[in-house]
């Protein structure tokens, strides 16, 4: 797959099509970098169109040297607001929408390599309203505190380039968002999450770009340092249990997944986030090995990893 340079747009002339073109370039760059780190497979592309307007490119890597399944989705869709969107956005006038972004989830083969998720997006209404959203979070199957600390440090560095208040604010937002009430546990070690961010379009977009561009170097590093670690059968089984909890969150609590399925979104692209294999064991006891219980003990909101 040919790598394309990320498009740089003069901020004073930026419009929705420029933002969409940037996200396409981000998808290209991330796919090229992650495939190079994996070294065992490449991303296959599935282009699709939406009857109401727009379309996207879903790229999936399967059975790589490190990644069992990885998806990088780009979309740019537009058209009349779905009735559920009208209610959700509390819109009282007849308007159309435009939405574009990149969504990523990666599931590794080795249980010591963490699951990662990224989403960066832009939404615009024909009445002139617009906002950005997104986030990046890490879900280790087995939490390694030193790596959790490193991950959060990288996010803080990016956030601090724009505003020192961003990291604590968006870290708390992620703790609250990536939480499964029915399990009373977080999905993983969190990260940052933000939504409905308006303000100055150019400034917010620069922040969103910085988050998107941090993904590949962060995850490539985590892949490299963990992929060769040996693991036991108990640790592999624990990985499937942790994947099961990931599935529960995505299908039961994730607003984007639920909203997409309820508004005639593209099902294959929406469910790209699910792992190829997961398990649910009745009354599972994580005490079968020390790292299992230690991981569940850290699936809590409000941990100051840094």
Regions found by a protein language model. Give the residues of each.
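Compact, glycine/acidic-enriched structural inserts
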Residues: 126-172, 306
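TerminUS-proximal long segments
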Residues: 267-306
């Amino acid at each position: 797959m040919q790598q394309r340079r990320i498009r740089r747009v003069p901020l004073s002339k930026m419009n929705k099509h420029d933002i969409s073109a940037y996200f396409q370039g981000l998808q290209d760059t991330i796919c090229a970098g992650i495939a190079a780190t994996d070294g065992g497979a490449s991303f296959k592309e599935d282009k699709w169109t939406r009857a109401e307007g727009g379309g996207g490119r879903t790229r999936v890597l399967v059975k790589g040297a490190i990644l069992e399944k990885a998806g990088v989705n780009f979309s740019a869709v537009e058209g009349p607001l779905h009735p559920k969107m009208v209610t959700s956005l509390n819109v009282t006038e007849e308007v159309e929408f435009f939405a574009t972004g990149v969504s990523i989830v990666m599931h590794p083969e080795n249980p010591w390599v963490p699951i990662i998720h990224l989403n960066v997006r832009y939404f615009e209404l024909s009445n002139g309203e617009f906002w950005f959203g997104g986030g990046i979070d890490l879900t280790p199957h087995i939490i390694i505190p030193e790596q959790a600390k490193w991950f959060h440090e990288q996010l803080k560095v990016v956030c601090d380039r724009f505003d020192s208040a961003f990291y604590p604010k968006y870290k708390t937002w992620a703790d609250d968002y990536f939480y499964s009430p029915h399990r009373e546990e977080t999905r993983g070690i969190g990260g940052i999450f933000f939504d409905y961010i308006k303000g100055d379009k150019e400034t917010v977009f620069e922040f969103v770009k910085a988050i998107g561009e941090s993904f590949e170097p962060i995850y490539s590093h985590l892949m490299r340092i963990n992929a060769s670690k040996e693991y036991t059968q108990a640790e592999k089984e624990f990985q499937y249990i942790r994947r099961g909890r990931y599935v529960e969150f995505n299908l039961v609590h994730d607003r984007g997944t639920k909203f997409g399925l309820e508004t005639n979104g593209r099902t294959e692209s929406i469910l790209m986030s699910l792992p190829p294999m997961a398990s649910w064991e009745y009354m599972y006891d994580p005490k079968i090995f020390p790292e299992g219980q230690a991981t569940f003990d850290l699936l809590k909101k409000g941990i100051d990893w840094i």
